[in-house]
């Protein structure tokens, strides 16, 4: 899988995103879920994920948070409290650190990673993974993502693709259970049958 951006930017990216999560959650006192909502809906997440130098290595953690908050319209930079000096990494710092690494390694959106591994789950992995190296966190993400895909396909097969003997217009598929890439419109312009969606293998 192709990394999201040049590896030379990665060390700074990890430090800065780690600092952003630490500062936002511990110094600003933002709930994790709220800050993550701000982060993934801001341009910062997209541009950081593409390796734009201004964001991955041109801003500190505090500056990233200030920019995220500015873009989402919640606070001015002058409202941001000073960062507290720390002698060691916090759980939130580690979570931001491995999140930056995983996004770089897999080249997917931060939002996609956090859908597979919510922030609270990432924090709970700290005791077992913080000494194992960042690549082990990526392994956990890959395993969880693969399991989610299998479970999603299974749900689609059981509930959406099973024949319905009571319905003369079979096949009928619950489109909400099928990933868009696995569904296609089975109706044609010349068909008199009702419009339906069919799951593809």
Place the predicted regions along the sequence by residue.
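N-terminal interaction modules that seed assembly of large macromolecular complexes
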Residues: 7-67
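Short alpha-helical DNA-recognition segment
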Residues: 39, 164-182
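Short basic helix-loop element that most often maps to the first helix and adjoining turn
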Residues: 155-169, 198
